[in-house]
Amino acid sequence: MANTKRELFLKRRLRVRNKLKASANGRLRLSVHRSSKNISAQLIDDANGVTLAAASTLEKGLGFVGKNNVEASAAVGRAIAERAKAAGIEECFFDRGGFLFHGKIKALADAAREGGLKF
């Protein structure tokens, strides 16, 4: 029987998370969550269990900023990079979860890289 979309998503998420844990070496994690309408990103210190910076399209000024949600995702990427710099964070690793690196996720990652985050 074929796998459902949800099963494939969960498999991808586990595969990505395990690869990231193996190569983490104490670095911070830029975790991304996408829904059909919004996207959010958090810089998480897994060693201490603390979120150091966060940005979301639910915030005032970061929502629907252009013709589509890809532009809003890029705005969230720029915001998280700016907040990371303010907190003194330059390097992290990108945790896309089970989401494909395409569209909104790619736009957020590219904008965060342009903003100065290295991953």
UniProtKB/Swiss-Prot annotation:
SUPFAM superfamilies assigned: Translational machinery components
Gene Ontology cellular-component terms listed: cytosolic large ribosomal subunit
Keywords of this entry: Ribonucleoprotein, Ribosomal protein, RNA-binding, rRNA-binding
Any one GO molecular function term: 5S rRNA binding
Signal sequence bounds: none
Gene3D superfamilies: 3.30.420.100
Keyword Ribonucleoprotein in record: yes
InterPro entries for this protein: Ribosomal_uL18_bac-type (IPR004389), Ribosomal_uL18_bac/euk (IPR005484)
The keyword Lyase is assigned to this record: no
Family of the protein in this entry: Belongs to the universal ribosomal protein uL18 family.
Subunit structure: Part of the 50S ribosomal subunit; part of the 5S rRNA/L5/L18/L25 subcomplex. Contacts the 5S and 23S rRNAs.
Role according to the record: This is one of the proteins that bind and probably mediate the attachment of the 5S RNA into the large ribosomal subunit, where it forms part of the central protuberance.
Protein name from the UniProt record: Large ribosomal subunit protein uL18
Gene: rplR
